[in-house]
């Protein structure tokens, strides 16, 4: 059963992956996954779904593909959305952090310059350092692992949705 690729979704071909020096082992794992499902390996110029990449390699593989394809704006907007989620989750109220994310979005959209982005990033770094110093002794360790796993899955789902795929089961290997 071949996977249907949504109209307008970002895809990659074997040739594009090869030309971008993809890891041979990771490529083989994705192709094996497709062969097990479809009974054959796709031709060099056949589009490969980023959902197939995600099923085998997770969010790291999808991010690599998007970088190899030159999808810099999509990756920047993904980073902005992840940063916003993190700020909301951590209940960050310092306006410098929120401004940095806003400027990063403007930069991704071509509305802010590199110097403006640098200034906002430095201010956010200072805010983060100040907050870390104030809350250093908080009990973060126990919840960190579970929270990271849940966030990783949420980020993969978000990235695939942004790349043109509908919300999907994000369990790697599922």
Residue ranges and their predicted role:
Residues 1-174:
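Short, glycine-biased loop/turn motifs at secondary-structure junctions and
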